[in-house]
Amino acid sequence: MPVYRNPCISAIFVKLMPYGNGPGVKYPDRIGSNMPLATRLTCRKGTSMSEKSGPQSIPAATVVVFRRAANGGPAQVLMLERASTMRFAGGAAVFPGGRIDPSDHELAMQLSHGFDNDEAAARIAALRETIEEAGLVLGMNVRVTPDQAAEARGMLAGHGALAPVLERFGWVPDLSTLHPWSRWCPDWKGAFDTCFYLADLGTGAVEVSKDDTENTHLFWASAREAIAMSERGEISVIFPTLRNLERLALHDSFAEARDFAARFPIRTVVPFRSEVDGEDYLTLPNDLGYPVTSQSFKTIRRG
């Protein structure tokens, strides 16, 4: 279980608390001056989701998919448990997502979307990975049937690119249906520089299924429910996922989360090391809307 620096904050009741940081954590820099300058410049440039990744990082995209809860409670989000054999975050519960491929950039140059090509490629990757990992087609111009979604998933397994799928079904993606949430880039070589997006399914009356290769289980839960599952040891959650679940738990609906995110210009989150009472913590800047901003290295799962 994380060690929360503000003793008033509970992961389950985080909605009741203002976001911010507890006492005792010192910030040497807005992002962290204890990391090499070159790394800070690589991962911290600008405030856009479309800023280019540094040469040592791997561009990636992920999407938090919302649906309304049948019981009228807080909205649920789609999570998947990665196969234990996966090199990154094996066995962990994560949001759908993955690397931004060259084919995503190629498609971005072909579509009319109103974004710069890097931003469009990230959004295309988020849509593609959600089909691959969950069999869920988001953001298209027409209603997609379960049979079409299954065929699209099969095509991606064979081709690996979204363009042939769009051509096969006559789909046109609306990239504006994805809303920026955050961007994370840890400060080590080969880290994923990940753009996080939000998407809304409304009632969520769709079929999703595991792919039996990269993931072994899919489930819907509110952010607060997912945090509780982690605290009970029912799921394993890595540091970035947990921090974003806590931020999502501040909100009962997709609209609330979307509007909240719009208050914070996208600035790359680079966790940094801090020391509190002789103990090392992994820490976030305290001005990005995260209600819990530090966790002891002793309790962190990093991926």
Where are the language model's segments positioned?
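Low-acidity, Ser/Thr- and Arg-rich intrinsically disordered low-complexity segments
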Residues: 2-10, 18, 30-33, 40
